[in-house]
Amino acid sequence: NRIIKYAQKEDCDSVVCAFDMDRDCLMTNEERRAFLEDKVDYLIEIPFTREMMEMEAEKFIDEILHKKLHAAHIVVGTDFNFGHEKRGNHQMLEKYAAKYGYTVDVVEKAYYKDREISSTYIRELLLDGNVPLANKLLGYPYEITSVVEHGQQLGRTLGFPTMNIAWPKRKIIPPRGVYLCR
C-alpha cells in the first residue's frame, strides 16, 4: 500500500518488482498478476537466472533500479537482500539513494504474539493446516487457482459437491483434507 499511496501523492506510476524464484510460493505468477492487476500500474517479473543471482548489488541498483526502472521511490522490508550473495540490503539502497536519485522507505517487521510475520511463518501455518490464521496475517484469503480434475466422485457420498484440483507446481498446499471453498 505504501508504494500505491506514494504514486498517487507524487502523480507517478506504481511498480511492483518481483523475482520469479524456483521455490515454494504463496502465490503463483498468475495469481500474483491477478492480485495486483487493479492495484498497481505495472508488475515487473524478473526471472531469477544465474546471471541475476551473480549480479553485484550496486550493479543491480545501477542497471535495474536506475537505468531500466527509473525508480523514484523504493519500498522494502528491513530484511530485504539482493545482489550476489545477498550483499545488498536496505542500508545499501539508502547509501546510494542520492547518487541515483531515489528515496527509500523501509517497512518495519510486524509481529503476531511475539512471532515475526514472514512468508516463512505463513508457509508453516499453511502446512500445519492453520489456514484461518494464515488468512488473518496475510490480510486476504489464501487461494489456490488450478484446473479441476475428475476423481473417484467420493464427494457425492459426503452429501455435498466437491472438486479435485491439480496442485500448481511450487505452490504451498495445506495438509490433505476437505476444505470449504467459495
Where are these regions (language model features)?
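Nucleotidyltransferase catalytic core that binds NTPs
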Residues: N1-R182
